[in-house]
């Protein structure tokens, strides 16, 4: 049972909450390099449209571009046959877009602007900003610079949305260290129809992994080491997957990416807490590791893709592809245990 959940929140949340325990597995299907296209570095998010078509967002030098990706896969094996890209639109009035989700109710797109601390709706053809509102709780505005919202996922029925900050909000504790992870609030929003605003419907505490490697300093001798959440993905049964990424040094600077399945069955709803340290005791979300990769691909975007012939689903990931990382596309096979 969830603890400290209001009657309204519980009625909105429980019907789409996955059952207690862990039930999913991931297997690598294929990994390829996407095209080297101008303005296509710093890819931060991806969302599935239909069949082989995805939308992905890049934010190179704070110039946001949404791309249409054509990624056909073999229906039997999940092998990626190609990755083709074309410019879809340039969303107006954006600054630091890190996440994208297609709205299944009307086909529009929602974008996360980390620096502006906003989730806004756009026309995917013209890039024009559209009416639409996400009522972010005040506590979510207390994020650290460059550690704000990067993730976004919407349920297949279009009535539930999830996001979170990359690492802990300032009143909730420190950033991740080599000894301890960072406490992040997984935030859920709901609406009754496409025209209605998204309203808060719960927050649950998730602890990221501690940093496994040694500090990574840039040319200015700034410590770039971090371990936080770069993406969320909501499955049809209500299960929430998290994508954690780490920058650190083992023998050389490298990226460590992990995908976790979550279990909320014993977690406490902390929506009404202004600071985790000041409130009553709470229970965190449980998690189970499904996939881990270490190397030079910095995976930041993740979404569900089409079904394969055996009923499993593709989980598609894209790497940032900036000067420090590869421009990779990773297809994983998601199936029940």
Label the predicted regions.
Residues 16-337:
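Sequence/structural signature of beta-propeller domains
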């Amino acid at each position: 049972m969830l603890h400290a959940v209001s009657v309204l929140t519980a009625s909105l949340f429980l019907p789409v909450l996955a059952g207690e325990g862990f039930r999913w597995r991931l297997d690598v299907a294929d990994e390829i390099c996407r095209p080297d296209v101008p303005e296509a570095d710093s890819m931060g998010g991806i969302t599935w449209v239909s069949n082989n078509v995805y939308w992905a967002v890049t934010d190179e030098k704070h110039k946001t571009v949404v791309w249409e990706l054509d990624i056909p896969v073999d229906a039997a094996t999940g092998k990626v046959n190609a990755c083709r890209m074309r410019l879809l639109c340039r969303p107006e009035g954006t600054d630091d877009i890190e996440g994208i989700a297609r709205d299944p109710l009307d086909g529009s797109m929602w974008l996360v602007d980390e620096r502006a601390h906003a989730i806004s709706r756009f026309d995917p053809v013209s890039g024009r900003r559209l009416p639409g509102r996400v009522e972010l709780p005040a506590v979510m505005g207390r994020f650290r610079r460059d550690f704000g919202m990067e993730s976004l996922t919407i349920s297949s029925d279009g009535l539930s949305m999830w996001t979170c900050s990359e690492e802990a909000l300032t009143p909730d504790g420190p950033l991740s260290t080599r000894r301890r992870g960072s406490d992040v609030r997984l935030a859920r929003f709901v609406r009754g129809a496409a025209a209605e605003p998204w309203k808060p419907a719960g927050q649950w505490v998730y602890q990221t992994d501690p940093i496994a490697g040694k500090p990574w300093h840039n040319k200015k001798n700034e410590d770039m080491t971090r371990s936080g959440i770069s993406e969320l993905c909501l499955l049809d049964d209500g299960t929430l997957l998290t994508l954690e990424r780490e920058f650190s040094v083992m023998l050389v600077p490298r990226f460590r990416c992990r995908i976790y399945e979550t279990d909320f069955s014993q977690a406490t709803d902390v929506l009404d807490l202004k600071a985790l340290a000041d409130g009553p005791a709470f229970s965190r979300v449980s998690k189970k590791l499904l996939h881990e990769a270490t190397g030079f691909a910095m995976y930041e975007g993740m979404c569900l893709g089409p079904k394969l012939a055996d009923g499993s689903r593709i989980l598609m990931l894209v790497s940032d592809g900036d000067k420090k990382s590869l421009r990779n596309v990773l297809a994983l096979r998601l199936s029940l245990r």
